Design a protein with these regions (language model features):
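N-terminal subdomain of nucleotide-sugar transferases
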Residues: 1-68
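Conserved acidic donor-binding segment of nucleotide-sugar-dependent glycosyltransferases
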Residues: 316-320, 324-331, 338-345
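Conserved donor-binding/catalytic core segment of Leloir-type glycosyltransferases
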Residues: 22, 193-225, 234, 276
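Short hydrophobic beta-strand element within catalytic cores of glycosyltransferases
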Residues: 295, 300, 304-307, 317
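Nucleotide-activated donor-binding/catalytic signature segment of Leloir-type glycosyltransferases, i.e.
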Residues: 243-267, 275
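Short His-centered aromatic/hydrophobic patch
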Residues: 104-109, 128
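Acidic donor-binding loop of glycosyltransferase active sites
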Residues: 271-287, 303
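Carbohydrate-associated surface elements
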Residues: 164, 185
Length: 378
């Protein structure tokens, strides 16, 4: 148990200083991670996250104000990072008064952060997101596979974003007593957005990779176009399957590849969409979803989500209540669900119920406060 003084302040007073603690993410600033990583800490009142990793990408400041590149930027920085990665030798950490806890993002992050936690005599907490524990290539000849038994032994809590992720972690040997299921919350407006009179498109947000069901969407869209349905589909993101979508855009009208957009622009796209498409599948390499953060994000904007009936997606979407579920990999079923939300009565009913569900169960402030309690020793 970490001992810290409770924080109280009178109205108008300067907020008390929070205690810094380290959050480890090896590559900080991947566009697909910015929103859900930041939201984990927005309700903290006693701890102040200091992000640390070996690589700081250009968009890293979007996750938090305090960023450290492991080893620094000086002439010895590359050597420090090499020794840390391969030998577990921890360079000096230029932060005073750190709380004795390290929060690592993703399973591999836990493996890399293990020597850091040991060097600081700090407790280790690891958040697992899905593919990080499910993808088979992560478990052969990697730093994760080599250090995993030690990570299990040293970690106080494995925080899982869904029950499905917790089940995979248990199969990887994590004791049930160390598993905590805590979905990442979402910032929900005080009032549900008013239904749009004429939303004009379906929406996908995420990386263009196999597990996101890109091929399923392509098949479904081709079926809809063959039936005369010309509703546009907007793809926000990027990735290795972009050529598949570029080919679709050449063949059929109404396909927009918007690239990565800032969080505010993504919210606006969600608020104006017929539906959010999340037809994820288990990839050939074992990569699978945990709980895609775009689902609660869409619900908070009153946007109906259409997702695969498996894993964390099926936990987040109540079929025909807060969204629609379809069998994984079933393009005809996805096309049917996309047609169904064309009915404004159905679309608005699902959108309102999704908003209420997100507000009740996935409020970012409450979920974040629960995480802080775990880090403090709860």
């Amino acid at each position: 148990m970490l001992t810290m003084e409770p924080s109280f302040s009178a109205p108008g007073a300067i907020p008390p200083r929070r205690t810094p603690f380290l959050v480890y993410r090896d590559r900080i600033g991947a566009p697909s991670e910015l929103a859900f990583l930041r939201r984990q800490y927005i309700g903290f009142t006693q701890l102040d996250p200091v992000w640390i990793g070996r690589v700081l990408l250009p968009q890293a400041p979007a996750v938090g104000a305090r960023l450290l590149r492991l080893g620094g930027e000086g002439p010895l920085g590359a050597l420090h990072r090499f020794l840390f990665r391969h030998c577990g030798i921890v360079p000096p950490i230029p932060v005073d008064g750190l709380a004795p806890v390290v929060h690592a993002q993703f399973a591999r992050g836990g493996a890399l952060a293990l020597p850091l936690a040991r060097a600081l005599n700090a407790q280790l907490v690891v958040t697992l997101h899905g593919g990080d524990v499910g993808k088979e290539k992560n478990w052969s000849g990697t730093v994760l596979s080599r250090r995993w038994p030690a990570v299990i032994a040293a970690t106080r809590h494995f925080v899982c974003v869904s029950n499905a992720v917790a089940e995979v972690a248990a199969r990887r040997g994590v004791p049930a007593a160390k598993l905590t299921v805590l979905p990442i919350g979402v910032e929900v407006p005080d009032q549900p957005p008013p239904p749009l009179a004429n939303p004009t498109y379906h929406l996908f947000v995420g990386r263009f990779v196999e597990k996101k069901g890109i091929a399923v969407i392509v098949d479904a869209v081709r079926r809809l176009r063959a039936e005369g349905d010309s509703t546009p589909v907007v793809f926000v993101g990027d990735g290795p399957l972009r050529p598949l979508l570029e080919a679709l855009a050449k063949d059929v009208p109404g396909i927009e590849l918007a690239g990565w957009l800032p969080p505010g622009a993504v919210k606006a796209r969600m608020a104006g969409a017929w539906s959010l498409l999340v037809p994820s599948v288990i990839a050939a390499n074992g990569d699978a979803e945990g709980l895609p953060s775009v689902i609660p994000e869409a619900m908070a904007q009153g946007c109906a989500a259409i997702g695969s009936a498996e894993g964390g997606i099926a936990e987040a979407i109540r079929h025909d209540v807060t969204g629609l579920l379809v069998p994984p990999g079933d393009a005809p079923a996805l096309a049917g669900a996309m047609r169904r939300v064309g009915d404004p009565v159905v679309r608005n009913r699902l959108g309102l119920a999704g908003f209420r569900g997100a507000a009740a169960d996935l409020n970012a402030g409450r979920q974040s406060a629960k995480l802080e309690a775990l880090l403090l020793g709860g």
